[in-house]
């Protein structure tokens, strides 16, 4: 008690010293940040979730963000785009304005001859040109097609019947026939996202001196048969989705997407210079609902700290150390990635491509199904979390992000303010009680950082589906509001 009274008696003299002001400031910041970490580490969220799961859910998130939804009617796309679906691993369907094609993997041959008189069928106008356009696009996507005896076709009576011979049963066959038309058919089928019964084996150099590679595939079926059919409910258990050609096939863009995670309104975490979470990093990453800021500071602080300051002060200062060169590399990598994504999205839109899986990835937000998407609407500012590629600006479909120098300027200002020469001269005038307060606050802050690092889960997800917020699922994977009403689905905990 005497030390506390003495400490408060010396307060007027304490605040006269710059170093003491710094310690007081850092202590208050550490305490406030520690309290904030306790509030946001997930522990309170986990407790509230366990108390409310399965009982209530709200469309208001963080008091200001409203959950809204946009529903896309994909049925009208069938007027301009062919739709596709799969009944099982061997039967796939494409339909266009009431008529369709059936693509079947089978071991039974339909055509016994080995020729395809496409020119004669074209002169006699024997087939549906819209459906034949789909077949032609698929055929032209087959790499290195130079073995016409490997396919057969028949257009008698206006019926489309095309058969591709396949011969890849195991790994050895796939390697031996890697450059044949059969492998090309499997390659094209695989890139159409219909390859659940096709196995990727290996890749071999082309041997033409171009440095390109040929991908080898295997399947247990002997033939691929394409026939026109009258459309019926062939895919009752599968939602038909648009299929695309051209750029998505030639560029083989299959995994480029924009990813945004829904995080707390203001969540700070330790990371490395690229923004990746790293307990040993010297960067503070502030995550918001719509963006993430990287707050890092220069190596000069650490150099001067190691030369003239004690260990406690340095440990705190190292938390805000940053290498500017690493930030420049990070910015260039992000800009390169954005340019690549811009190219992919523009190619998709220019070719009238809206593929189900890619659309889901591009949204990067909670969703209920493939046609209804949820997004956040800020009731104060009007900002929404819909992807920028949906907003047309300057004739493009994706706004390019240009980084400013605010991070570097803020780093320099912080270093200049914290590392003044007067600190070295007046460091010895710091009272012991203030040092104890500083040590306590930094220890409290370190403990709360550990709570963040263990990543306490806060809610349940259904395995294989998106974030169910604001719905709170119970152990049976259901919510009382009726949005999730299929019990027994596997769940997992998420932060």
Curated annotation (Swiss-Prot):
Zn(2+) 2 binds at residues 459, 461, 467. Gene3D superfamilies: 6.10.140.1590, Arenavirus glycoprotein, zinc binding domain (2.20.28.180). Keywords: Disulfide bond, Fusion of virus membrane with host endosomal membrane, Fusion of virus membrane with host membrane, Glycoprotein, Host cell membrane, Host endoplasmic reticulum, Host Golgi apparatus, Host membrane, Host-virus interaction, Lipoprotein, Membrane, Metal-binding, Myristate, Transmembrane, Transmembrane helix, Viral attachment to host cell, Viral envelope protein, Viral penetration into host cytoplasm, Virion, Virus endocytosis by host, Virus entry into host cell, Zinc. Residues 34-58, 458-495 are cytoplasmic. A lipid is attached at residue 2 (N-myristoyl glycine). Glycans are attached at residues 78, 88, 107, 117, 165, 228, 369, 377, 394, 399. Residues 2-17, 59-436 are extracellular. GO terms for cellular component: host cell endoplasmic reticulum membrane; host cell Golgi membrane; host cell plasma membrane; membrane; viral envelope; virion membrane. It holds the Pfam family Arena_glycoprot. It comes from the Viruses. The record marks 33 as: Important for GP-C-mediated membrane fusion. The record marks 58-59, 263-264 as: Cleavage. GO terms for molecular function: metal ion binding. Disulfide bonds join 85-235, 116-153, 178-216, 283-296, 305-314, 368-389. GO terms for biological process: fusion of virus membrane with host endosome membrane; receptor-mediated endocytosis of virus by host cell; virion attachment to host cell. The chain crosses the membrane at residues 18-33, 437-457. Zn(2+) 1 binds at residues 57, 471, 479, 481. Belongs to the arenaviridae GPC protein family. This is Pre-glycoprotein polyprotein GP complex.
């Amino acid at each position: 008690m005497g030390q506390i009274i003495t400490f408060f008696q010396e307060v007027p003299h304490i605040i006269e010293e710059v170093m003491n002001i710094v310690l007081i400031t850092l202590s208050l910041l550490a305490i406030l940040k520690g309290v904030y970490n306790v509030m946001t580490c997930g522990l309170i969220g986990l407790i509230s979730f366990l108390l409310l799961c399965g009982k209530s859910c709200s469309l208001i998130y963080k008091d200001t963000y409203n959950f809204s939804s946009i529903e896309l009617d994909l049925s009208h796309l069938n007027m301009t785009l062919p739709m596709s679906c799969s009944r099982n691993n061997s039967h796939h369907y494409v339909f266009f304005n009431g008529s369709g094609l059936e693509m079947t993997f089978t071991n039974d041959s339909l055509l016994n001859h080995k020729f395809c008189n496409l020119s004669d069928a074209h002169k006699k106008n024997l087939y549906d040109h819209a459906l034949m356009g789909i077949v032609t696009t698929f055929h032209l996507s087959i790499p290195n097609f130079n073995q016409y005896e490997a396919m057969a076709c028949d257009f008698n009576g206006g019926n489309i019947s095309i058969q591709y011979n396949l011969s890849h049963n195991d790994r050895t066959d796939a390697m031996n026939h890697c450059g044949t038309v059969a492998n090309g058919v499997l390659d094209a089928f695989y890139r159409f996202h219909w390859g659940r019964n096709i196995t990727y084996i290996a890749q071999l150099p082309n041997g033409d001196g171009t440095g390109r590679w040929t991908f080898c595939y295997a399947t247990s079926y002997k033939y691929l048969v394409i026939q026109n059919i009258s459309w019926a409910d062939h895919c009752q258990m599968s939602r038909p989705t648009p299929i695309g050609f051209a750029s998505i096939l030639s560029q083989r863009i299959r995994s480029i997407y924009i990813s945004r995670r829904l995080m707390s309104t203001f969540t700070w975490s330790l990371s490395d210079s690229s923004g990746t979470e790293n307990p040993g990093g010297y960067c503070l990453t502030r995550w918001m609902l719509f963006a993430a800021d990287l707050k890092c500071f220069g190596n000069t602080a650490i150099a001067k700290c190691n030369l003239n300051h004690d260990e406690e002060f340095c440990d705190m200062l190292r938390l805000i150390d940053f290498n500017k060169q690493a930030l420049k590399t990070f910015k260039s990598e992000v800009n390169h990635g954005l340019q690549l994504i811009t190219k992919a999205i523009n190619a998709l839109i220019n070719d009238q491509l809206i593929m189900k899986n890619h659309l889901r990835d591009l949204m990067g937000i909670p969703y209920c199904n493939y046609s209804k998407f949820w997004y956040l609407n800020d009731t104060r500012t009007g900002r929404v979390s819909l992807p920028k590629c949906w907003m047309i600006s300057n004739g493009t479909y994706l706004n390019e992000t240009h980084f400013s120098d605010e991070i570097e300027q803020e780093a320099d200002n912080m270093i200049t303010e914290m590392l003044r020469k007067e600190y070295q001269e007046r460091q010895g005038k710091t009272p012991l009680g203030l040092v104890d307060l500083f040590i306590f606050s930094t220890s409290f802050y370190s403990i709360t950082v550990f709570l963040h690092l263990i990543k306490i889960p806060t809610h349940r997800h259904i395995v294989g589906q998106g974030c169910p917020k604001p719905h709170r699922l119970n152990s049976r994977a259901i919510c009382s509001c009726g949005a999730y009403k299929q019990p027994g689905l596997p769940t997992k905990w998420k932060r």
